[in-house]
């Protein structure tokens, strides 16, 4: 999970991406994909505001709709089989923006690596993709406080025959290792001693499950949430117990949040006010629970502290 945040849990630029720590995919990749996004994109492109704190919230209220950048990653933000927008971030966005006076949300699907470039080029108004907060991304966008926290987990064959519990086990047991495009898990594995050239990169957790089931790899690394969900119907694979990856020898817990353009501090602050109220009332968990989130994923982490990492 987007992983959901990782080498950019969306590619080296993903809701997970690689950065000076374990960032998630390198956020600068995806410029090419941005071109495609612009071609396909929205008919309406918002203009940047020079007003202190930005005036986007006022404009969204007047329009009655907010455009959400999503990456098609279950359970964070995706279009379901009925063609409807759903996922933890879009559903949370519906609740928060309704409270802020914006009645509708409109999806703008793109690659994970194009989310930040797309946001900053006005292709959409906010990133709603469960994106991990890290220092590299904080240089390009501003984040709300995290609406969830996340540990890592592995997909392994039933019974976990190699006894893989964390990245150090992958190295010690010379396990064949895979993870997703731009996932922060790339950085975590390299930090533990896995050679980057030995990592099999696949599009997402479904492809990772398929690789494990087909015995192409011994293990696929993702977020505890995404691995837990994707193996539910598998007869050949299981998810390991969640664990914290080590960064500079210290356990790391990631947090996912909504991203905004750096000029739109007023919108970010208003969003945070409503998010804090949802956390305090317990409504946040009720909104996220249908997507596999539990009390263990609730968090008091702040964007400020995660941006320092």
Question: Where in the sequence are the language-model features?
Answer:
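Ligand-binding clefts/hinges and TM-proximal coupling segments of bilobed small-molecule sensing domains
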Residues: 44-48, 184-199, 239, 272-309
């Amino acid at each position: 999970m987007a992983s959901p945040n990782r080498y950019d849990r969306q590619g080296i630029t993903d809701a997970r991406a690689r950065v000076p720590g374990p960032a998630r995919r390198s956020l600068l990749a995806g410029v090419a994909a941005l071109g495609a996004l612009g071609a396909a994109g929205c008919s309406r492109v918002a203009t940047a505001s020079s007003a202190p704190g930005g005036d986007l919230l006022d404009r969204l209220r007047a329009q009655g709709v907010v455009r959400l950048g999503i990456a098609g990653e279950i359970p964070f933000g995706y279009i379901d089989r009925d063609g409807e927008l759903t996922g933890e971030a879009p559903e949370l966005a519906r609740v928060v923006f309704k409270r802020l006076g914006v009645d509708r949300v409109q999806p703008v699907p793109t690659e994970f690596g194009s989310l930040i470039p797309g946001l900053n080029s006005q292709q959409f108004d906010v990133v709603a993709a469960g994106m991990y907060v890290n220092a590299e991304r904080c240089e390009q966008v501003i984040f709300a406080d995290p609406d969830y926290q996340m540990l890592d987990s592995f997909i392994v064959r039933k019974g976990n025959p190699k006894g893989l519990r964390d990245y150090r086990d992958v190295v010690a047991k010379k396990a064949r290792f895979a993870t997703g495009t731009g996932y922060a898990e790339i950085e975590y594995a390299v930090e533990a001693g896995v050679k980057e050239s030995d990592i099999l990169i696949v599009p997402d957790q479904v492809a990772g499950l398929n690789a494990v089931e087909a015995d192409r790899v011994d293990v696929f690394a993702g977020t505890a949430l995404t691995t837990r969900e994707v193996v539910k119907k598998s007869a050949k694979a299981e998810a390991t117990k969640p664990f914290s990856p080590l960064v500079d020898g210290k356990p790391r817990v990631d947090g996912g949040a909504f991203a905004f353009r750096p000029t739109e501090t007023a919108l970010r602050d208003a969003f945070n006010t409503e998010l804090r109220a949802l956390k305090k009332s317990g409504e946040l968990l009720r909104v996220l629970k249908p997507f596999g989130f539990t009390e263990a994923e609730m968090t008091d982490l702040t964007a400020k502290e995660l941006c320092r990492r």
